[in-house]
Amino acid sequence: MDLADIRQTIDGIDTTLLNSFVERMDIATEVAKSKIEMGKAVFDPARERSKLNNLAGRAPERYEAQTITLFRLVMSMSKAEQQRYINELKGITVSQKAHATAAASDTPFPQTATVACQGVEGAYSQIAACKLFDVPDIAFFETFEGVMRAVRDGFCEFGVLPIENSTAGSVNAVYDLLAQFDFHIVRSLRLKIDHNLLVKPGTKLADVCEVYSHGQAIAQCAGFIEGHGLHATKYPNTAMSAEMVANSERTDVAAIASRSCATLYGLEVLEPNIQDSDNNYTRFVVISREPRVYPGANRTSLMITTANEPGALYRVLERFYALNINLIKLESRPIPGRDFEFMFYFDLDCPFGSKALDDLLDSIDDVCESFTYFGSYTEVL
């Protein structure tokens, strides 16, 4: 057979496979109906293991692993279809709620709003807020939780919080608070962070013994701090540390903060750009008490808890793969009160309104204990 004949044969086999796959997926609804009548869950691990072992045993030895991979994927898509059908019977689905939210907020992202930020004037959260909103009315709070409470209580319409840094990693305190408060992420921003060593006028580097800043900033400037033998002390916020140094009677202290803090608090930039990496970015999220999906949303955030058993997280990841959804962030955090058990945060690169995302939202609960849809939004670069 020449290549043209081989390809023609492959086309015929692929047509047979496609027809069989469609037939297999169509019958998933009948399977769901039977499981409802019998009171059975969508996922039956014993049946699935038995089925996969049987199929692998019938396949040629050289194709056993590929057979398991193929049919595990088919079963995952079948379970997703079964769960989607069951959720539709229950009433409005998660994706339908999300689309209703988008329809209700079918306006551009607001240019002005009351915004809660952690810290004081000059904080990086303030800089982020001013890039996200043209005219933000900013209220400052000492802690991340204070920002959350301000939004929850209606004092501010939005909150701006740092959630991860390209050098120092995730801001775990914010992830933990997201699990406690019923909020929605409506936008995000990647902000380039350039840290500066700020001192009182006339202070020399040789005079500095102790440097104050937020823990994330200290981690991002670890090389500079260690290289100069400085003692680092954590402070609630970079701008607050600059304010503290300005008000201190000591002349042997410095702050790591933004350049704008030097002007605000009468300090000097002793050493500019002291971060370990020039490619230093912090990602900020905008939180809202009300669910909102603005036009152009192409990123989705979820929180998922799984059973504490082998393969539990794999089944979630398998569902993403089956629906061809790109996973761009996975973060695990301990579940309070449950030793050595974790919740998982996912960021997905998937346009809002796509069939893949709708199918995921309407079926993911069959492979996890619980999940929270934080929202779909645009990331500003």
Stretches found by the model and what they are:
Residues M1-L381:
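Domain-level signature for soluble enzymes in the chorismate/prephenate branch of the shikimate pathway
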